[in-house]
Amino acid sequence: MAMKIGTAAFKERVSEGIDNEFMRGAVSGAQERLRTRRLQAAEELGNWEDWRSHAEEIRQHVLDNLDFYLEQLAENVANRGGHVFFAETAEEASSYIRDVIRQKNAKKIVKSKSMVTEEINMNEVLEEEGCEVTETDLGEYILQIDDHDPPSHIVAPALHKNKEQIRDVFKERLEYKQTEKPEELVMHARSVLRKKFLEADVGITGCNFAIADTGSVSLVTNEGNGRLVSALPKTQITVMGMERIVPSFSEFEVLVSMLTRSAVGQRLTSYITALTGPRQQGEADGPEEFHLVVVDNGRSRILGTEFQSVLQCIRCAACINVCPVYRHVGGHSYGSIYSGPIGAVLSPLLGGYDEYKELPYASSLCAACTEACPVKIPLHELLLKHRQNIVEKEGKAPISEKLAMKAFGLGSSSPSLYKMGSKWAPAAMTPFTEDDKISKGPGPLKEWTAIRDFPAPHKSRFRDWFKDREKQKGEE
């Protein structure tokens, strides 16, 4: 699965999301629960704004010194017997992973949750190679066996499905014969996945944060699948975005605390795992061979630009969990594996405006996302910058909008035209006016007034009122 999901036009995706009542209900309920838990967890920690500022400083420092920390990380991974590959593009990353699989003559792969592996289209590349790739995160596994349904949320990928739908998928694909009770569904998935872990030739993981001064990679999970993926297969491949790095475990401690509280409202997740290279002499488990793939895929182009702060993201989805637009349209409407406010900023940077020019407009600019972000990314400001770029640099504004703005500019800059327009506007809008509101506007106002009323022009103009007032004062 590449970064782009689906081929439908943006308006079609949005309409489909709005028409999906179950999805909107599920998203709304999840947002309320996760928001409440996040606020409680933040209050428990205390001095939340100070923690946010500290986390922001850590991420900014890393980005400003990224070359140093990446070099340090690579050196320490190599010192522990691991292999490091820096991939400039998605194709380079997936090709390197495919080559490692070929060298090992591996056919069965288990994989923990990773957004960047979806970004580089890794699963599809390996499946074309004849490999069986099994997602072991429960949400991702459900989507995989349901005809590779795309994820709709960064943290909860199967948020758009209910337990009855999941039961039906299990019955069709896994010969499931029990009820839709979550406990029974989980136990059945567990029994299936355990066999996959034991049979796997290669394990592939993502990386929440890499620790530069030790050469470690970390996995933050609630299911424990990350540990099995990294401990049982003889070969482990970890894939990370080049920005997902911290200087030491001291900074890791701060960021993982912010991550777990912001993502799911927990002090810590059930499992926090740090892996440092292949199995060393005297160690009981772990892979015999370890590969770290560091993915650029457009990230270096963002460094040093007005959008650099988006690379501070720790993938907690706190912005998604407060977004009113996401609440109504869902994750699939964004057409990218990165949805919500963070996706609306990041997707155009990685995939280009031609593919994602609509996403910066999928926002009310209420700034709830910015307030929720644990590393203080100014998301609503970055969305505005995208809009400016789309119009000024890319020339993507619709022709109708350009003509309307030119006409407005011409009329506003000419006293005689402005006077004439303000005189005739009330009469021109009369057929569309009811109770001093335009409820079915013409032309550009049609879509706007389909869901809201537009104030009708006043019949008396300010210039006329002022003229009459001055006349009355003179008569007095």
Curated annotation (Swiss-Prot):
**Which residues make up the binding site for [4Fe-4S] cluster 1?**
313, 316, 319, 373
Q: Which domain of life is it from?
A: Bacteria
Q: Sorted alphabetically, which keywords does the UniProt record give? A: 4Fe-4S, Electron transport, Iron, Iron-sulfur, Metal-binding, Repeat, Transport
| GO molecular function per UniProt | 4 iron, 4 sulfur cluster binding; metal ion binding
Record keyword ATP-binding present? no
Pfam families according to UniProt: Fer4_8 (PF13183), LUD_dom (PF02589), LutB_C (PF11870)
Task: Provide the 4Fe-4S ferredoxin-type domain boundaries.
Answer: 304-334, 353-382
Q: Indicate which residues the UniProt annotation says bind [4Fe-4S] cluster 2.
A: 323, 366, 369
Output the GO biological process annotations, alphabetical, semicolon-separated: lactate metabolic process
Q: Which InterPro entries match?
A: 4Fe4S_Fe-S-bd (IPR017896), 4Fe4S_Fe_S_CS (IPR017900), FTHF_cligase-like_sf (IPR024185), Helical_ferredxn (IPR009051), LUD_dom (IPR003741), LutB (IPR022825), LutB/LldF (IPR004452), LutB_C (IPR024569)
Family designation: Belongs to the LutB/YkgF family.
Entry function:
Is involved in L-lactate degradation and allows cells to grow with lactate as the sole carbon source. Has probably a role as an electron transporter during oxidation of L-lactate.
- Protein name, UniProt field: Lactate utilization protein B
The upper taxonomy is: Bacteria, Bacillati, Bacillota, Bacilli, Bacillales
Gene name of the encoded protein: lutB
